[in-house]
Amino acid sequence: KGCKPLTYCPQGYNEVWSKWSSNASELETLKGLDPSISIYWTGADVNSPITQSTIDYVKEKSGHEACFWINYPVNEHAKSGIYLGDITYYARDGVTGMAGAVSNPSRFAESNKVGLFQLAALFWNNKNYSENAQTVWEDAFRYLEPEVEDSYFKIASNVSNCPHSSRIGNGFPESEYLKDTLASVLNKINSGAALKNDSEVESLISEMDKIVAAVADFKENCTNTKQVQELNPWLSSLNDVATGIKAILKSAQALQENDAEEAWTNFGTAAKALNMWNTYNTGDGTTKAEAGSKRLQPFLSEVTAYVKNNLTPLMDSSNTDFTPKFY
């Protein structure tokens, strides 16, 4: 009495678990509860989008409305990542019939705010949310850290995936604005197309400079010191991968121009960055931060392997195709 409304968490708090033999009759049994009680529900599985079908499912099976339990921005399923991206993986337009919604955050209190800002907007009004998702995401940085808004957004655009996730097989959106350019440049490299003065290659090199500058600006000028401390492992990882991409592209260009010294020097920079990329401890004693894991690091890894395979044979002193000035 006097405790309404209550929200109850069943053992089978998602569609998959509710169908296990041990939980098969649980939702049906819940029909006997007071009608005011809502049910904690994570959707089709443990970490799932908010869909109309799953909201209807729990209502039909239990007779109660769902209080949607969204497992975001918690990163327990992929601790090498920290989630600063948009929430389009979870958001669906116009879902009705929920009693409410709650977020399961990570232990990174300051970094959680990017996701929580967006979830608050979604929970307040989910009509046509997808049309406004990008704007809401960008607004978060202006609201949270206005003194480094642009730099924070640049960082977040490349630090949002959930690497090696046990729950989200295809990962979260990350580096989407570079997706086409990365693919095109990689194709040019593999096909032997001329790289010097290529507009896409130069654009990608310039973007890596901007990422490195954003990291430096954020570290120096963000007034939220706790935020900087939380993100520092991922900032170091992102700085490495951006530095590495710039260097390996310069190396590939030099390789085509028969400049062995330039090719080798930049290759060394890229290889070192690639080796350091996932060596920064996130604070739990074991897990290492992985920034740019969806597109940037795979690109760096593949181009580094390509340059190595083409550069190493030319370091043979008997080879006359190159004239290494450092001999």
What are these regions (language model features)?
Residues K1-V136:
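Catalytic-core regions of glycoside hydrolase
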